[in-house]
Amino acid sequence: MQLNKIKLALGFAAAATMAMPMVASAAADQEKAMSNANNWAHPRGQHDNQAYSKLTQVNKGNVKNLKAAWTFATGVNRGHEGSPLVIGNMMYVHTAFPNNVYALDLNNDQKIVWSYFPKQDPSVQAVLCCDNVNRGLGFGDGMIFLQQNDGQLVALDAKTGAKKWDVSNVDPKVGATNTNAPHVIKDKVLTGCSGAEFGVRCFMAAYNIADGSLAWKAMSTGPDSEVLIGADFNKENPLYSALSVYEDVNGGNKQGGSFKKIPTDQLQGGVADLGVKTWLKPQAVKDGWQHGGGSVWGWWPYDAKTNLVYYGTGNPSVWNPDVRPGDNKWSMTV
């Protein structure tokens, strides 16, 4: 596994090579809600993604006495991942495919205030990995954000459930899906991509919460310009940017030869476009990086002090490593 810190300026469309000022937060209501421990306004509680609650009513001394106070049946008998959101007296519940959303009034016997039922093509379930799950909802700027399994990112009015906007993030017809929870950070909503099992080239993307327009997209593989790698990338650890840990000794990069491991002290660091150059053998009619996987399905902590988002990419594609020798950057990377 390679360890690489990717710095993404959340207020801008491309990777920054210098300190950049942030725009004013459009999700001030999210920040206010998260400051109150009675709320759960982020899919993991806070931007640090630790899922830790400061509430003390339930503790190690009385947890054994907990009993169910009430239940709510979603009607979807598949894996339910991710917690509901709670903002004030409202609870927002999501389901596995077809990703229904319910807004419940906790002050009125959990009455359903509004509901949203996406119309998705059932065939998307055939390319979902690891059950038809959805990992949660996002909140900010008076909206609830849902990342549907079919790739549609949807913004719903938190009070009424009315759709404010939606945008297509991935295409299930090529094996790409979404199972992640949207993460709202300032004026952006971050989402990812799943599908490395099917040779999808995945990414992390940020959309403007005001209108759903794309702010930036960082691919998991490919040229530096598409991965959003800046000039100062891995400056302190250049060996993490080594060309390869293998040497092509018989034309394997294009013709199918043989490879041997390069001694650590002979690694060449600071090389550009490693997301292309470390895929040492083509698959079918394309170079491997063009369908190299690297799913991004969460979770993504944000550090407000440094303005950094940390995220990991998943396994390279295809599964068989014999047909994609090399480091396969930037899959399996932080």
Regions found by a protein language model. Give the residues of each.
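Gram-negative bacterial Sec-dependent N-terminal signal peptides
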Residues: 1-25
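Beta-propeller domains
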Residues: 260-268, 272-333
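Hydrophobic/aromatic beta-strand positions that recur at structurally equivalent sites within the blades
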Residues: 58-61, 104, 156-157, 207
